[in-house]
Amino acid sequence: MKKIRSKIMDRQANIEKSIAYLAADEQVRCRIPSSPGERQRLLRALMNVWEPKELPEEFLAMQDAELQAQAADKGVVTIESLKSNAVNNPFLLWQGDITRLQTDAIVNAANAQALGCWSPLHNCIDNCIHSAAGLQLRKACYDHMQGRLLATGDAFITRGYNLPAKYVLHTVGPIVTDDRPTKQQEEQLASCYRRCMELAEENGLESIAFCCISTGVFRFPNQRAAEIAVSTVKQFPRKNLKTIVFNVFLDKDYAIYRALL
């Protein structure tokens, strides 16, 4: 019991030090909450607005310890555990938090700046992935982009850092303004899937998990987006890739993909 209590206290002290470092770095005044959950939220909020720069190893060690503890708390989902629920191998369908998946790569639906979501505690997939991976991910994206914008339909790859996934594939899908995608936007969405699979093949990856690119705030209709996703992935000439996971969050997306697969 004493060891458990000591471990909990060490973890809370670690979060407090991480918050203090980022608050000082960002010149933000904040009161550190007493609740462990609220401390985690404050740390995430500070991470979400962090301007990319070099970070000291001491901070990274503290951050990594906390994020890996959070990953363990959520539970890691392996490919093997998904295969028992396979709709049709090698294409798997899973509903849940993509940051739990232990695939070679997960796909992030990014924006054109490709530096993550800057809105504190926002629940978009971009924010969730960056928050779980750690600040190294934003720095890696910053170093790759060099102030450029990522073209719609293009993608690039980074390490996954504190995620169970080894890599993250960042792609930008089309934004649909009137719920009726044009032929160009449909091709751009297909390009997102092709480009991610090309990068996966180039890097010798064997498994990849796709989120529902461009649905949600980008307003691509869910049914048509899923049709494009499934047809594009199935038609892609795979060599190294053995397992493709379609990851969904909403019940309606699960029903759509289940019917298509």
Could you describe each region identified by the protein language model?
Residues 1-261:
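Macrodomain-like recognition of ADP-ribose-binding/processing modules
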